[in-house]
Structure formats: structure tokens, C-alpha cells
Amino acid sequence: MSCKVSFIGLGVMGYPMAGYISKAGHNVTVYNRTKAKAEKWAKEYKGNVADTPMDAAKDSDFIFTCVGNDNDLREVTLGDKGLFKTAKKGSIYIDNTTASANIARELYKEAKAKGFDFLDAPISGGQAGAEGGILTVMVGGDEAPFKKAEPVIDCYS
């Protein structure tokens, strides 16, 4: 099953994670604050580059974020060009950031209000785990969207 996926945040963890999703046959669009890094990723993995998180999320079935902290997460989700502005109804948003429980609850409520699902999915395994596609993912959220997202999450875990 090939899906339309967006991945926001191409740091030492996100870059290879998004790569594994692409290698599994999914159509991946990436966004990174440093556009040159996104362009490098797109060339390496044959993906697409978006100018904003909002553009990346548009029409995606699954939206992933892997950013630095709560403030970065708020910016890419709820900010002026955040993904919550364009995430389509029925899509599933998976956050791999190690963030606070408060922001996870906030994003869950906001996603529900906009008609899409949210999974809080922090990761463990470090850069080596990300590069090897063997991360441990601890997912919190509703079971039905988890079951739908699990095959995509499995690409990097």
C-alpha cells in the first residue's frame, strides 16, 4: 500500500526516518527549516520538497514531525504556516518529537477538532537506530488510527 506522507524535520533522526518511509514505496514530501537539507534529502530519496509545513501536509494521508522541542513543535503545527492549517480530514498526524505531555494533549484536542487523528510517538534508539531503521517507538493515542499508521511507522522501527 503506497500512501502520501509528509515528514517535517530532517535532523539526525528525521532524515533517515523519512528515508526509510520513502524506500518502502511511499510518496514522501519533506519540509525542513534549512531548505538545502530538504533538497539533499529529496535528491537522495526521490522525494518532494515543501516550502512550509502547511504545504507539506496538504493532501497527505500521514504527517510526521520530528523536531527539537515544544516550541519548534508548536511552530510547525499551530504556527502561521503550520500543518494544522491544511491537514485533511481523516489524515493521521504522528509526532516523533520528545515533547511534553502538555503539548501532546493540546495537539490531540486540536487535531480532533479539525477532523484528523493524532498519535504521540516519541522514539528511542538514537542516531544509530534511526540510520539502521531499528528505532523503538512508544505510541500513545487512539487504537484505530494507530492500526492504520502502524505499517508506515514500522518502516523505521
Model-derived features with residue positions:
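Rossmann-fold NAD(P) dinucleotide-binding segment
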Residues: 53-117
